[in-house]
């Protein structure tokens, strides 16, 4: 699969982009080169703290997961409390996520979930080719 290609660094010493015959294309939900919006802010803060070596779609996805759940918990309101059982919390979150809840974060905007838990969000097409090394 193409997981992680979004973090490909064509400037790494020893990386020979000419070994890519023409180009490699992949779909991703995160642009690790973004400088604008929520993703740009995430990238700036992340690289200030951890450096750019570990920046990838996986960290961005984890970040969005935490904040999507946080937002859904706020949306659930008093259906969730410190005394709620794990089962009750799960039921409340399933209700929120399955009833039109949307989240905008670093991996996309207006992210929605279906009633059976599948996520719906736009993917972006990226192309890595020899000209990227210049």
What are the language-model segments listed below?
Residues 1-134:
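Extracytosolic ligand-binding ectodomains
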């Amino acid at each position: 699969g193409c997981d992680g290609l979004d973090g490909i660094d064509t400037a790494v010493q020893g990386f020979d982009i000419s070994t890519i015959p023409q180009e490699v294309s992949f779909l991703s939900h995160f642009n690790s080169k973004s400088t604008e919006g929520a993703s740009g802010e995430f990238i700036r803060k992340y690289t200030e703290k951890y450096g750019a070596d570990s920046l990838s779609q996986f960290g961005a996805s984890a970040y969005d997961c935490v904040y999507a759940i946080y937002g859904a918990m706020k949306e659930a309101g008093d259906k969730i409390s410190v005394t709620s059982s794990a089962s009750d919390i799960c039921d409340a979150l399933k209700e929120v996520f399955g009833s039109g809840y949307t989240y905008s974060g670093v991996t996309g905007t207006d992210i929605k979930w279906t009633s059976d838990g599948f996520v719906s969000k736009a993917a972006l097409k990226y192309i890595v080719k020899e000209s990227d090394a210049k």
